[in-house]
Amino acid sequence: MQIIETFGHYVENLTNTKPDSARWLLKTGWEAQNLKFRYMQDKRLMPADRHLANLMMDTMLRPLQKPEDSVIVSIFTPCEMMQEVGLHPYNVEGFSCYLSASKAERAFLQQAENQGIAETLCSYHKTFLGAAQKGLLPKPKCIVYTNLTCDANLLTFRTLADFYQVPVFAIDVPWNQTKENVQYVADQLRDLKVFLEKNIGKTISEDRLKERLVCSKRTLENYRKYQQLRADRYVPSDLVTPLYAGMTNNILLGTAEEEKYTQMLLEDIKKAPAAKGKHIYWMHTIPFWSDAVRQELCFSEKAQIVGCELAETCEPDFDPENPFEAMARRMVYHSLNGSALRRIEAGIRHAKQAGADGAVWFGHWGCKHTLGAAQLAKKKFEEAGLPLLILDGDGCDRSHGGEGQTSTRLGAFLEMLGGAENE
């Protein structure tokens, strides 16, 4: 742990005078970690989840290794067309998580606030903006984002486009779920195709795009089946694997690597032992850095996180033969688009599929969408027979504190569910 802290301080300090050196150090440190994921894997995890750790690290390294082939995206932007022109997508939430895991987030949060960014803005976005402003993040080829679910996107990506002076494309997703709105978004995605072809200099084959959408559909179907099968199984889990799935099941949809991960899950679950302890379904992001949460839910036979809503935000009910409409449908009918009730109902449905005994609604600092829906969520989950704990905190900024309260409230919740029955 001391090594990680020292590494983070070096990265933070170098950005003040030598941002290129800081970037090299960050890249080198992450490459070393990737070698560990590849050759010194955590044997407590299932093989699929070990593969996922390596896949996620590859995704975060690419913008540092080949920034000219990278595109900054918002988390729920469909990325199949970007993959088709050879761009590697990476997102604010994923990259900021890795900076936080490297204990290098504090200087970037402060940088963003010093530049006038509100303290109440999501800490993932502040960390990413600060890292860009201090020169740690290299210039991407372009930026593609959507207004879907997160209002911070509107500030962050316009600011980044102005800062880097790169082409930017915004996708407007209406609130209501209608055929007309699907068509409206599909037309924008056709414009995105033209945008990418113009700025990258490559042609996007519609037949190849259809193949990618077929792959995306299979991937989502595999993951849904896995979540159903794990209901009566014990799957050892840490706090980052559910987040990895939440990232890759969005920005890597359409890739063979992500489909391979879901295929491995289906093989692994066949060999998993019978369920042990209590199953917890997690709504929104996970404070992976929290010792209090780690103590209760990391590799514990008494209670495990069996799913995170970020990995199950859309259904595989689209037609790949109409690729633009298929991607548009994923966005318009996204579980976090529209009224909070849609999100809550999707969470209840997915929690029950995974055999959850209870759920945690994590009120991440600055996320109005989540904070505002908390009381309604508690009412609806408990009416559906699922006890729900509302837990406030920060998924990225460890200086947010509140560890004592987190430990007390989470411990009491699990004890109420019976998680301590074998003590």
Predicted regions span which residues?
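A charged, amphipathic alpha-helical module
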Residues: 2-69, 190, 194-317, 336
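An N-terminal, globular interaction/scaffold subdomain
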Residues: 51-120, 129-133
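Gly/Ser/Thr-rich loops at beta-strand to alpha-helix junctions
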Residues: 71-80, 147-153, 283-290, 365-372
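Redox- and metal-dependent alpha/beta enzyme cores, enriched for Fe-S-associated oxidoreductases
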Residues: 75-76, 81-111, 277, 281-352
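Glycine-rich, highly charged phosphate/nucleotide-binding loops
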Residues: 115-133, 336-349
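Acidic/His-rich segments in extracytoplasmic proteins that coordinate ligands and/or metal ions
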Residues: 126-195
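Hydrophobic alpha/beta core scaffold segments
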Residues: 295-309, 320-330, 334, 339-423
